[in-house]
Amino acid sequence: PSLTQVGLMEPMATLAAMAMCSKTLRLGTGIAILPQRNPVYFAKEGAAVDLLSNGRFIAGVGLGWSGQEFAAAGTPFEHRGSRMNEYLEVVRSLWADETSSFEGRFYSLPECIQLPKPVQRPHPPFYFGGESEVAMRRIAQYGRGWFGLYLKPEDVAPRLTSLTEELAKRGRSLSEIDLVVSPGNDLPVERMLEAYATQGVS
């Protein structure tokens, strides 16, 4: 289901194609709804894109918001946050560890080896969508970047305050996080860019 009649390309296949016709462009999902995806396949696809692009893949992931979309994909909408946390552990291990196994409430992975590994070590960076307190905690634990969706410049600061606090609890700082915001206003372009830049985002 979509809010518009504009279709969206499947991201991993699209990024693989883009990897073959570019040399320096960073390639990321913005975002892949991880609780809808099999984590083993997502890890395999991500590693392939990272190899094809020689280490330019960004794993942009999020929870999703549409129960209708989850139903269409045949995946449960409930407990998607807890499911995503387990999937993140599985994907991270498959990318970073020589052997992987996992036993959780929503996913079990017998001991296995996934090859080839990504170029980026220990693994491609995770960027996260979402603006809730839980989302900020997830970024602080796993992330290298944050995608803010349709936020006005004045709405960015409270999220960054929350994120800074969560990062500090883990001995991290905001300087370690790439901040990317999709515009949520109709300001002229130059004024808009200046307003977001004052908040530290691109």
Where are these regions (language model features)?
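Active-site-adjacent structural elements that line small-molecule/cofactor binding pockets in enzymes
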Residues: P1-S202
